[in-house]
């Protein structure tokens, strides 16, 4: 009985380790698997031998120049906004942020935490954690259009539930709650600078 157990154990070890010319064979790292792609971007899943998943992403210009390429812990979500602009939402353990990529010129925007609306030119986001404000601004130009609306509250959180532009495209109507169980409120954020000839 002991001999049979020893033989069985030896065979099992051979299957587990594997051999190549008398040396243990290492298990290769798995290849990346594309989970999302387009003309100018690709998101791939990487899984190591321990089963831990990570994601890589690459964004390129129309002519193939790499704008940005990196690895992140959570799967990013890509949203093409038009033929020359991508928005990518990245997720942390407790938050999310969006970065925009101009795939024609190669520009990359700042990271907008808690972004909840965009139209290809402007982005609206909740800056409540830092300054209790809702902000709408130019995606790329720090000196471009910017409007801030202060929201006074004792609540620690502001949750945007809906954001829609008016039919004329000049105002963004934002519905939000202060805290998880707060009553829903509305605020209007202008999308056009009335003091100039446009955005």
Q: Model-predicted segments: where are they?
A:
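Sec-dependent signal peptide recognition
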Residues: 2-10
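C-terminal motif of bacterial Sec signal peptides marking the signal peptidase cleavage site
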Residues: 15-18
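Bacterial signal peptide processing site
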Residues: 20-22
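Long, hydrophobic/aromatic N-terminal blocks
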Residues: 28-69
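Repeated scaffold domains used in trafficking and secretory/extracellular systems
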Residues: 28-35, 71-81, 110-125, 155-165
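Short beta-strand elements that form the blades of beta-propeller/WD-repeat-like
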Residues: 34-51, 82-93, 118-129, 134-135, ...
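Surface-exposed loop/turn elements that mediate protein-protein interactions on large endomembrane-trafficking
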Residues: 52-69, 92-111, 132-155, 179-199
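Right-handed parallel beta-helix
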Residues: 72-100
């Amino acid at each position: 009985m002991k001999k049979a157990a020893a033989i069985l154990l030896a065979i099992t070890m051979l299957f587990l380790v594997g051999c190549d010319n008398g040396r243990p064979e290492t298990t290769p790292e798995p290849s990346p698997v594309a989970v999302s792609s387009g003309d100018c971007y690709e998101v791939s899943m990487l899984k190591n031998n321990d089963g831990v998943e990570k994601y890589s992403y690459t964004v390129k210009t129309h002519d193939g120049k790499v704008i940005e390429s990196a690895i992140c812990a959570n799967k990013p979500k890509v949203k093409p906004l038009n033929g020359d602009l991508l928005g990518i939402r990245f997720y942390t353990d407790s938050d999310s942020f969006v970065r925009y990529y101009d795939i024609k010129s190669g520009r990359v925007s700042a990271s907008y935490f808690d972004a909840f609306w965009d139209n290809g030119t402007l982005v609206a986001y909740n800056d409540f954690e830092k300054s209790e404000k809702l902000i709408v601004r130019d995606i790329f130009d720090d000196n471009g259009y910017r409007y801030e609306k202060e929201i006074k509250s004792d609540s620690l959180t502001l949750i945007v539930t809906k954001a829609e532009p008016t039919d004329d495209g000049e105002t963004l109507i934002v519905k939000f709650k202060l805290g998880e169980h707060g009553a829903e409120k509305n605020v209007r954020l202008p999308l056009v600078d009335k003091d100039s000839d446009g955005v």
